[in-house]
Amino acid sequence: MGSETLSVIQVRLRNIYDNDKVALLKITCHTNRLILLTHTLAKSVIHTIKLSGIVFIHIITSSDYCPTSDIINSANFTSMPILQNGGYIWELMELTHCFQTNGLIDDNCEITFSKRLSDSELAKYSNQLSTLLGLN
């Protein structure tokens, strides 16, 4: 498998209901299998939760190529439309513009989101995450 290297993938988040609003997510992962990581991201579920003014972006994946703990990223986004009313959970539906002929991943890789979960599911996840982070 070879030695693992630290790879950074920048992904633009787009709100399908307001295409003018985007945010940038930087995923850092120790892996030497970027193509497989990209395939994994295409099947992942991305959670975004705003707690105490901080936006937590959590990518849920069962990938062996990039453990979940390595791709949890937190940032203080001030204008992220998918976080209205405290946060939405979106399912990753499409991963485009991510492959180059040389096998590298394009820095402008774009993700399209869909499928907002119910408020009860969102509240349950928010409570679990808040407990995990020690914020309640």
Swiss-Prot record:
One of its GO terms (cellular component) is host cell mitochondrion. Coiled coil: none annotated. It comes from the Viruses. InterPro entries: Pneumo_NS1. Keywords: Host cytoplasm, Host mitochondrion, Host nucleus, Host-virus interaction, Inhibition of host adaptive immune response by virus, Inhibition of host innate immune response by virus, Inhibition of host interferon signaling pathway by virus, Inhibition of host IRF3 by virus, Inhibition of host IRF7 by virus, Inhibition of host MAVS by virus, Inhibition of host RIG-I by virus, Inhibition of host RLR pathway by virus, Inhibition of host STAT2 by virus, Inhibition of host TBK1 by virus, Inhibition of host TLR pathway by virus, Interferon antiviral system evasion, Modulation of host cell apoptosis by virus, Viral immunoevasion. One of its GO terms (biological process) is symbiont-mediated suppression of host toll-like receptor signaling pathway. It is found in: Host cytoplasm; Host mitochondrion; Host nucleus. Belongs to the pneumovirus non-structural protein 1 family. Monomer. Homomultimer. Heteromultimer with NS2. Interacts with the matrix protein M. Interacts with host ELOC and CUL2; this interaction allows NS1 to form an active E3 ligase with ELOC and CUL2. Interacts with host IRF3; this interaction leads to the disrupted association of IRF3 with CREBBP and thus reduced binding of IRF3 to the IFN-beta promoter. Interacts with host MAVS; this interaction prevents MAVS binding to RIGI and inhibits signaling pathway leading to interferon production. Plays a major role in antagonizing the type I IFN-mediated antiviral response by degrading or inhibiting multiple cellular factors required for either IFN induction or response pathways. Acts cooperatively with NS2 to repress activation and nuclear translocation of host IFN-regulatory factor IRF3. Also disrupts the association of IRF3 with CREBBP. Interacts with host mitochondrial-associated membrane (MAM) MAVS and prevents the interaction with RIGI. Interacts with TRIM25 to suppress TRIM25-mediated RIGI ubiquitination and thereby RIGI-MAVS interaction. This is Non-structural protein 1.
